């Protein structure tokens, strides 16, 4: 009900206007875009992908929730900047996809994942606190109930979301 606060959050998301210059903006959350070598999709590297996959999948959950709240009031942040938030969900989703036969397995290892971490597109990322030279395998395969937001949006709009769809189907 606070239109000033809502507008401030949307402007901050799009333009990084505010106190915390290193966080909150979509281009900081998704600093690099990569062509998916297996499809026509664009994958958006999450700023947390080099830290660990627990944080990367949390970013997907939080970004999806924020974009859905904005969408509910008529502001389509899923589509903003050529679907940058969707590209992030697809990147994180693809990297963390677990083979069907391994999905309910406790401890996951490299062979349990569909895609090899050594050949996965990644650009070294730095912020004021740290530098991540490679994509992290820590907590890879973290399961969070967030994929339905992205998949549902993309299905409604007729947009491809291969990896969000696979996660939504597995959940």
Language-model features: locations:
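Short, contiguous, pocket-lining structural segments
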Residues: 1, 5, 55-58
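CBM-like carbohydrate-recognition segments
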Residues: 77-171
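Long, well-ordered core segments of solenoidal/helical folds
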Residues: 3-41, 84-101
